Amino acid sequence: MNKAVFLDRDGTINVEKNYLYKIEDFEFTEGAVEAIKLLNQNEYKVIVISNQAGVARGYYTEEAVDKLHEYIQKQLKKYDAHIDAFYYCPHHPIHGVGKYKLQCKCRKPEDGLYKRAIKDFNIDVEKSYAVGDKLSDLIPAVDNNIKSFLVMTGYGKEEVKNIKTDMRITKNLYSFVTEII
């Protein structure tokens, strides 16, 4: 079985910018590249799980999301780092348009994408972690017995006051990695 770190994307890996899809707007959070490289070196599967409601709302396409993920991989490769997989939900139950207006099991806080990744990568949840800047990023991890960390980047500073579960708090993705390695 494999150990993994499940990462939210916006506000955790990259600076939070509403409905980010343009490559020119992408910016890693401080220490994110180094953190991902350390996770790779320590044999963690690095798996991104992200809600992409901008697709559901018609702001951008799934192809734009895929293009941005390819760009992220290209940037990480320059530092001998990589993300093992990107999973994202393009749906929204209220604000979705057309086929994307859907109450699904993949949109966080539901755990459908976590369950799929756990199966796809044969993940040992007891040796795994989740990191995000919103409680809704971490609820599916907690539901699957994955140790969870709320980062103070993105929406983390606003979300911290609502913590009621056994989540830990850390400055950013890099500080999380230094705590577990």
Swiss-Prot record:
It catalyses: D-glycero-alpha-D-manno-heptose 1,7-bisphosphate + H2O = D-glycero-alpha-D-manno-heptose 1-phosphate + phosphate. The record marks 107 as: Contributes to substrate recognition. Its EC number is 3.1.3.83. Substrate binds at residues 8-10, 16-19, 50-53, 107-108, 134. Mg(2+) binds at residues 8, 10, 133. Monomer. Belongs to the GmhB family. This is D-glycero-alpha-D-manno-heptose-1,7-bisphosphate 7-phosphatase. It comes from Clostridium acetobutylicum (strain ATCC 824 / DSM 792 / JCM 1419 / IAM 19013 / LMG 5710 / NBRC 13948 / NRRL B-527 / VKM B-1787 / 2291 / W). The gene is gmhB.
